[in-house]
From Swiss-Prot:
Species: Komagataella phaffii (strain GS115 / ATCC 20864)
Localization of this protein: Mitochondrion inner membrane
EC nos: 4.1.1.130
Gene: COQ4
Xref: InterPro entries: Coq4, Coq4_euk
Catalytic activity: a 4-hydroxy-3-methoxy-5-(all-trans-polyprenyl)benzoate + H(+) = a 2-methoxy-6-(all-trans-polyprenyl)phenol + CO2
Description of how the protein assembles with itself and partners: Component of a multi-subunit COQ enzyme complex, composed of at least COQ3, COQ4, COQ5, COQ6, COQ7 and COQ9.
Protein name: Ubiquinone biosynthesis protein COQ4, mitochondrial
Cofactor: Zn(2+)
Binding-site residues for Zn(2+), renumbered to this chain: 191-192, 195, 207
């Protein structure tokens, strides 16, 4: 009887052990199958994605538009310091002026200009169409045949007299946002029209006067810095002329003038330039070249 009971117990235990062993073995087999199929690992795409999120500390981000050069904040600071010193020591070097302009073109400044453009019909059209000024797009050969006092003819004659071209404007490359980069590029390309409408020449004194006019009208930091520091190293006679004649003119006219960033110059080339000045609220300053000529003549007479 005892033997039978023990046999019955064994007959119960043995199947249980066999069942447990098969279950364990089955788990191992399923585990091996999953490992073979790669189901226990990240999917390949997710793994690669996680690997791509980590990059070297100073790996430059991808550009946001053609020609864009992304900069870290410390690089922008270094560019500002270097270009500001360079522009003060050698203001005729355009590279310093260009770098200083972009390193101080803060987003809040450009956003304010963009808002002004969005609130104006012409400004909105400019933002939508994003035109760029070149000799080809402006058709200079046609402008020279415009009426004598038209904006187009005046612009052409000013380019001829000063020996400059709209093709020399350097593309913006350090401003991060594409639309804000266009806003600053638009200012840069319209600079020669500001010379044309005011009659100020491309001499150091004329550029300084125009910088203050631009700062009062547009609020671009680089123009304010230029108006503040550029008169320091020039001749005392030029500085007196700026402070007595052209700075008061620039403050008054830059303040009351309509925002020049909204002027679609390409669309109004046939407009009479005197009528345009009146519409914009600009009073033409005294002819700087004539004043400089008279000052030199007077100096020779005294000598």
């Amino acid at each position: 009887m005892l033997i039978v009971q023990q046999f019955q117990k064994r007959s119960f235990i043995i199947p249980s052990l066999i069942s447990s062993g098969l279950s364990y073995l089955s788990k191992d087999i399923r585990l091996a199958d999953k490992m073979e199929d790669g189901e226990l690992h990240f999917p390949k795409t997710e793994f690669e994605k996680s690997q791509n999120t980590s990059r070297p500390l100073f790996q430059r981000p991808e550009p946001n538009y053609p020609g864009h050069v992304p900069l870290y904040n410390f690089e922008k600071l270094l560019m500002f310091l270097g270009s500001s010193i360079g522009a003060f020591v050698n203001p005729t070097n355009n590279n310093f002026i260009v770098s200083l302009g972009e390193s101080t073109a803060f987003p809040w400044v450009l956003n304010r200009l963009r808002t002004q453009m969005l609130n104006d019909p012409s400004g909105r059209q400019i933002l939508k169409e994003r035109p760029h000024m070149t000799s080809k797009s402006l058709n200079l050969d046609e402008l020279k045949n415009y009426p004598d006092n038209s904006l187009g003819k005046s612009y052409f004659l000013w380019l001829e007299r000063e020996g400059v071209s709209p093709d020399t404007r350097v593309p913006v490359k350090y401003i991060t946002d594409p639309e804000l980069a266009f806003v600053f590029q638009r200012y840069r390309e319209c600079h020669d029209f500001y010379h044309t409408i005011t009659g100020l020449p491309i001499v150091r004194e004329g550029e300084i006067a125009l910088k203050l006019f631009e700062f009062m009208n547009l609020g671009i930091p680089m123009t304010g810095l230029g108006a503040l520091f550029a008169p320091i190293p020039i001749k005392s006679s030029q500085r007196r002329r700026l402070l007595s004649v052209y700075y008061p003119w620039a403050v008054k006219n830059g303040t009351i003038c309509k925002p020049l960033i909204n002027v679609y110059w390409e669309k109004i080339m046939k407009k009479d330039i005197d009528v345009l000045r009146s519409e914009l609220g600009i009073e033409k300053p005294p002819d700087m070249r004539e004043l400089r000529k008279k000052a030199r003549s007077k100096k020779k007479q005294v000598a």
